[in-house]
């Protein structure tokens, strides 16, 4: 056969080589009926062919070359497992891919013609031959694998044995069931596409490249077997029967014909039963038809061929009955089946146990496989092992106490654990399972890839040190578990987000990052660790950029440095890594050929120009201008900043609190960073690292959630940034700027001592709970809110209380309140009284002045406490109140000036000193209805003084019914101003010309109810006064100590309720006199009580002491006497008349006498009529304050209660050998003989005196006293009262006595 050769420049060898130009073609007639007569050409895709008639044809009429390459390389939108993928075409329309999780093409080798099937095996086409460069030497990631043997089957299926376990992928471990009929295959492997279930397969390869555009083919014959140009598509399986699978490469618009060089590449189908991708076969050839159609032919998966080769290179070692398996001089002994034929075989151990090397063991291409969930110990002094690697399958654990050969790399796969306990002095490559580093500098370097492996530290200095600490995270990375150890890095050599630094130990780790130049970490950080970046001095160009993610509840600490958190520019395939180069002299450079990258870019220049998307063809993995960025989530406890810069860039979601000192914080930074080597950072054989960082402007959405505490710092929130301050914001000497386009929401309150500049949106709300109800939040700005742009918006709603002046010269917007809000939106965690005091019953309260003459304000359900002259262009007020008041720095009257006012159902409360007042001036237009004017009197009005004080002015022809006068409760009075409307030539005015005042009965009643608390506390002490003496009549002891605890609740009208816990302790002694027994004693008491009503609540703590005596005559008569003093500390909060919270002390005295007669019906039963009289003294109190500018006072004088009680008790005793129990019940009537004290109220309407009232009630009780032995007694009593204005709802009395 004639062979034609030509000289070609080789990019691989860098010189000239001889290349055969011979092309092979086989022609035949199609089988079948004559009407389907066709001419076909069958071409083995591994043969070199000069013609492009059979070359790859990526159809780029409406798709980009990069789409096909992203497809095969799992880049861009084509991530493994992704669903609902839509490709945006050049014309702007989209193509939705079949409805199936996108395949993981990692089993496909770099050159595309072989596919890993797990372990040290791969598949290809037989016609590629063993010596073909893509078969003899196979590459995945940064690793090179040599073929050592292969096995083939008809027609063209081959499986290779490699010299190492492949660590970059688990491989395509299963094939399709080729015995199925086409219909059965459709059911099992079919997927939905465009509304129909079809037998669709996915493929990837890197054969000779050409592109087809609008029917015209452009060849790039010099491009083949280039890993960067790996490309793919999905195809339709037309024929499943027979010994070949035929696919239609052109059945859809996203078509890419399999090409020369694609021979052996795998065809993947989705197994709907196993929910995974499996291999249907490998490319054998292509059929080209006379009508231009094209089919690819695939040799079917052959499991028998695979198993035969695996069996050839496997040796099973059952250690179930062996204590130790010994390997010496290449011979295995001690397992009951000793052999010397183990060279190049995988030794597959089962049963667990010890493996002893008595000499170094070079197993060639064979590895050590541990095949069950057992523990194995590999020992051997200083002997070494060399081979394909270690495979810890099925959760097995291997304790590695030998060394690996230092001239080779140890490959580790399998989901189990390799526990390395000796320094290895070599490199590790791992892709699966766990490797424990249990020695200092366990490995020289570690290459971790595929995302399924973990390396765990288990010794100090377990990593080798150096700039990267000897660990390199290649494609899809893996996990480094610090395991409680601290670790420092200058740079972490990570190529993508699959790299993870974590700490799974309960002992916290510290991860220190000490880069000395700008550096991007593409990976993730999580677990129980703190992150530190501390420098002695601050300098530029030493920025740490995180574009992967952080997930920890711990802290990050920065000192004298810069940190950026941002998203990651989505990586895409490139045509070539690096620029075009030619080493030949100038006269011979034509031999180097053309720059194929420039040629490919030229084919798509028109689409790029039309769509403005140069990033599609710029041969860069990413570009600042591209629209697709991956969002990074950064979650931490607190970020501590000291003299540092922190920025949140595009596509970042940051969750955590910030504490800053002398630092700069930017949220929504427009500066972004990309790495032109991202995804390809790891170089050489896996132990090198590179980065090429480009910075520039690029904006995308930014999210921040958390709180900020900052001192002497700056905060800038930029366009497209959304900040949710869910925790408190504290800004001391810190200027905050919200730029145009920024959206900021605060929920938990804020304090600032500096101006807050707003060009974007600031919303202040209450703090929501899980039911979306709100706790009130306070926003206090000691400076001002500056609205610096026409688009600026200041919003407050949902229980926000805002304090601070507002200034603007722009057409900004102020929106306060929520028209659907009411108290029902309060969180159940909130005191309604507190909310009422803070918000005044409105949705929002605002205290401050507004100087914004060009701005518009909307107030719904808002209480505006206006503290200074204010101006607005427009104000719309609904269901709100404008309350003119003073501030610490401004005691003057104020004027609110508005060009246009639309007001409905609102109130305007103004102050007057009877000669001047606050004013509302409307310049251009006033409209509305149902609005009221209220007037606070700073001085007491006198009826004889004539008033004429202008309150409101508006343009003439304004409806005079916009405002009307309304009564206002001030203090204890209802004050109704007399408002007179007058119209002149240019305006209409509403003026105060008088007032009407009447007492407010409800406020008066509330004041009396509050002051009656002391009487009710006195009454509770009375009810507990004589309890001790009643006990004495049921005991016979001489002397003793006793204790009593009583708890009760009471109620009265007006929503009043109280509860108390009263504790008494004391001692007493019995004196036997002629005809009577006399007991004398001393007691001390402590009482905790609380009381509440509709308009007040509070608590009282009381302590007291007293003396008592009880005389019991032998005839059954008795008399009890007691004297007692009690001191009370009170704290009460009232919501009427602006009283607020008051702390005050009072005291009371008690003198009581009770007489009665115990008549014994039988020896063990008795009836006891009784009468009691208690006289006392209760100290008075006085409060003085101002309500809405009016002076008020409340006072009650000392008074002397006198309370009587009559009643009868009955009882019966039950006794045994050494015990006695007395049961009793009582019924009584208690009544006041003197009225309670008088309360005096004073306000603008004068003085009001409220006389005290008498009360009475019926008392009921039941109880038990028990005597155990001679000296221990205890009792229990239950009480209740009825028919009184105040009643004891229930009370429990427990006592204990010890006699001595």
Swiss-Prot record:
Cleaved to release the mature protein from the outer membrane. One of its GO terms (cellular component) is cell outer membrane. Keywords: Cell outer membrane, Hydrolase, Membrane, Periplasm, Plasmid, Protease, Secreted, Serine protease, Signal, Transmembrane, Transmembrane beta strand, Virulence, Zymogen. InterPro entries: Autotransporte_beta (IPR005546), Autotransporte_beta_dom_sf (IPR036709), Autotransporter_pectin_lyase_C (IPR012332), OM_autotransptr_brl_dom (IPR006315), Pectin_lyase_fold/virulence (IPR011050), Peptidase_S6 (IPR000710), Peptidase_S6_dom (IPR030396). The keyword Transmembrane applies. The active site is at residues 127, 156, 263. Pfam families: Autotransporter, Peptidase_S6. Its EC number is 3.4.21.-. CDD domains: PL1_Passenger_AT. Residues 1034-1300 form the Autotransporter domain. Encoded on an unnamed 94 kb plasmid. This is Serine protease EspP. It comes from Escherichia coli.
């Amino acid at each position: 056969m004639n062979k034609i050769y030509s000289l070609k420049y080789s990019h691989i060898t860098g010189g000239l080589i001889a290349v055969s130009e011979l092309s092979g073609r086989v022609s035949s007639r199609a089988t079948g009926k004559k009407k389907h007569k066709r001419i076909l050409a069958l071409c083995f895709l591994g043969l070199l062919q000069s013609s492009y008639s059979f070359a790859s044809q990526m159809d780029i009429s409406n798709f980009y070359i990069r789409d096909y390459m992203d497809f095969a390389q799992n880049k861009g939108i084509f991530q493994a497992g992704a669903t609902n993928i839509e490709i945006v075409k050049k014309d702007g329309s989209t193509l939705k891919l079949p409805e199936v999780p996108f395949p993981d093409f990692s089993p496909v080798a770099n050159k595309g013609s072989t596919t890993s099937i797990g372990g040290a095996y791969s598949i290809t086409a037989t016609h590629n031959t063993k010596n073909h460069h893509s078969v003899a030497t196979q590459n995945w990631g940064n690793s090179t694998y040599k073929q050592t043997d292969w096995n083939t089957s008809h027609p063209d299926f081959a499986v290779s044995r490699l010299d190492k376990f492949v660590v970059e992928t688990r491989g395509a471990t299963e094939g399709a069931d080729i015995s199925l009929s086409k219909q059965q295959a459709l059911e099992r492997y079919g997927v939905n596409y465009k509304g129909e279930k079809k037998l669709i397969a996915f493929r990837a390869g890197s054969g000779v490249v050409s592109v087809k555009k609008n029917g015209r083919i452009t060849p790039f014959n010099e491009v083949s077997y280039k890993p960067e140009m790996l490309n793919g598509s999905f195809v339709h399986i037309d024929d499943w029967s027979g010994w070949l699978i035929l696919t239609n490469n052109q059945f859809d618009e996203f078509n890419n014909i399999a090409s020369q060089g694609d021979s052996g590449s795998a065809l993947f189908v989705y197994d709907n039963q196993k929910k995974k991708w499996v291999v249907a076969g490998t490319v054998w050839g292509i059929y080209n038809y006379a009508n231009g159609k094209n089919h690819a032919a695939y040799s079917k998966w052959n499991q028998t061929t695979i198993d035969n080769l695996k069996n050839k290179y496997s040796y099973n070692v059952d250690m179930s009955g062996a204590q130790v398996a010994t390997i010496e001089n290449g011979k295995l002994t001690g397992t009951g089946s000793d052999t010397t034929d183990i060279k190049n075989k995988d030794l597959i151990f089962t049963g667990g146990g010890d493996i002893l090397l008595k000499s170094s063991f070079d197993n060639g291409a064979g590895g050590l496989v541990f095949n069950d969930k057992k523990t194995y110990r590999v020992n051997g002094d200083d002997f070494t092992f060399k081979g394909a690697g270690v495979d810890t399958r099925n959760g097995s654990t291997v304790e590695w106490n030998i060394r690996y050969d230092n001239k080779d790399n140890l490959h580790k796969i399998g989901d189990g654990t390799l526990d390395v306990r000796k320094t290895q002095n070599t490199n590790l490559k791992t892709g699966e399972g766990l490797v424990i580093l249990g020695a200092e500098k366990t490995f020289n370097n570690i290459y971790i890839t595929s995302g399924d492996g973990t390396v765990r530290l288990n010794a100090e200095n377990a990593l080798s040190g150096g700039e990267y600490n000897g660990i390199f995270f290649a494609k899809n990375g893996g996990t480094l578990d610090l395991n409680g150890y601290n670790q420092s890095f200058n740079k972490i050599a990570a190529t993508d987000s699959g790299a993870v630094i974590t700490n799974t130990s309960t002992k916290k780790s510290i991860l220190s990052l000490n880069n000395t130049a700008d550096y991007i970490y593409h990976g993730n950080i999580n677990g129980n660790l703190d992150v530190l970046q501390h420098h002695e001095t601050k300098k530029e160009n030493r920025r740490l950029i995180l574009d992967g993610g952080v997930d920890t509840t711990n802290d990050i600490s920065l000192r004298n440095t810069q940190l950026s958190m941002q998203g990651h520019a989505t990586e895409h395939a490139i045509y070539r890594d690096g620029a075009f180069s030619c080493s030949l002299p100038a006269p011979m450079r034509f031999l180097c050929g053309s720059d194929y990258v420039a040629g490919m870019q030229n084919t798509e220049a028109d689409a790029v120009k039309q769509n403005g998307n140069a990033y599609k063809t710029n041969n860069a993995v990413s570009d600042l201008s591209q629209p697709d960025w991956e969002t990074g989530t950064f979650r931490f406890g607190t970020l501590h900043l000291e003299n540092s810069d922190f920025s949140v860039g595009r596509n970042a979601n940051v969750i955590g609190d910030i504490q800053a000192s002398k630092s700069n914080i930017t949220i929504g930074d427009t500066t972004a960073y990309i790495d032109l080597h991202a995804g390809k950072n790891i170089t050489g054989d896996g132990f090198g690292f590179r980065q090429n960082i480009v910075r520039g402007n690029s904006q995308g959405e930014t999210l921040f959630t958390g709180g900020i505490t900052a001192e002497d710092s700056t905060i800038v929130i930029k366009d497209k940034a959304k900040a949710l301050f869910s925790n408190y914001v504290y800004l001391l000497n810190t200027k905050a700027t919200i730029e145009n386009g920024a959206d900021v929401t605060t929920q938990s309150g804020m304090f600032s001592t500096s101006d807050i500049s707003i060009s974007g949106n600031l919303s202040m709300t209450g703090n929501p709970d899980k039911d979306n109800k709100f706790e009130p939040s306070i926003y206090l700005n000691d400076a001002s809110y500056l609205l610096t742009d026409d688009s600026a918006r200041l919003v407050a709603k949902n229980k926000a209380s805002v304090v601070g002046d507002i200034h603007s010269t722009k057409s900004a917007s102020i929106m306060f309140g929520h028209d659907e809000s009411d108290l029902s939106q309060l969180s159940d965690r909130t005191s309604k009284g507190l909310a009422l005091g803070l918000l005044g019953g409105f949705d929002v309260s605002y205290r401050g002045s507004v100087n914004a003459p060009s701005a518009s304000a909307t107030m719904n359900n808002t209480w505006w406490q206006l503290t200074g002259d204010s101006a607005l262009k427009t104000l719309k007020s609904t269901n709100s109140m404008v309350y003119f008041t003073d501030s610490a720095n401004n005691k003057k009257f104020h004027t609110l000036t508005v060009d246009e006012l639309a007001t409905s159902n609102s109130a305007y409360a103004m102050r007057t000193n009877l000669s001047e007042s606050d004013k509302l001036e409307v310049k251009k237009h006033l409209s509305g209805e149902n609005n009221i004017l209220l007037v606070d009197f700073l001085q007491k009005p006198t009826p004889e003084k004539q008033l004429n004080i202008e309150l409101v002015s508006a343009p003439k022809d304004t409806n005079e019914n916009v405002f009307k006068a309304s009564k206002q409760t001030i203090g204890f009075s209802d004050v109704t101003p007399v408002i007179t409307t007058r119209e002149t030539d240019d305006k209409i005015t509403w003026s105060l010309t008088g007032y009407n005042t009447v007492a407010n009965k409800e406020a008066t009643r509330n004041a009396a109810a509050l002051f009656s608390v002391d009487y009710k506390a006195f009454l509770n002490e009375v009810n507990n006064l004589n309890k001790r003496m009643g006990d004495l009549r049921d005991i016979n002891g001489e002397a003793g100590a006793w204790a009593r605890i009583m708890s009760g609740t009471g109620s009265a009208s007006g929503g009043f309720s109280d509860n108390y816990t009263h504790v008494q302790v004391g001692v007493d002694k019995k004196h036997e006199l002629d005809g009577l027994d006399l007991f004398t004693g001393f007691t001390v008491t402590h009482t905790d009580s609380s009381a509440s009503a509709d308009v007040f609540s509070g608590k009282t703590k009381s302590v007291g002491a007293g003396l008592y005596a009880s005389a019991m005559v032998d005839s059954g008569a008795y008399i009890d006497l007691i004297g007692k003093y009690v001191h009370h500390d009170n704290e009460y909060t009232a919501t009427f008349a602006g009283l607020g919270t008051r702390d005050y002390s009072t005291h009371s005295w008690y003198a009581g006498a009770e007489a009665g007669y115990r008549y014994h019906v039988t020896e063990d039963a008795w009836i006891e009529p009784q009468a009691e009289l208690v006289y006392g003294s209760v100290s008075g109190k006085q409060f003085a304050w101002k309500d809405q500018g009016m002076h008020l006072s409340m006072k009650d004088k000392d008074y002397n209660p006198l309370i009587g009680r009559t009643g009868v008790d009955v009882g019966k005793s039950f006794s045994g050998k050494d015990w006695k129990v007395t049961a009793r019940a009582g019924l009584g009537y208690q009544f006041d003989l003197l009225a309670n004290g008088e309360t005096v109220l004073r306000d603008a309407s004068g003085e009001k005196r409220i006389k005290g009232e008498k009360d009475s009630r019926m008392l009921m009780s039941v109880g038990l006293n028990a005597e155990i032995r001679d000296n221990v007694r205890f009792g229990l009593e239950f009480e209740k009262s009825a028919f009184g204005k105040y009643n004891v709802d229930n009370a429990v009395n427990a006592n204990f006595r010890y006699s001595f």
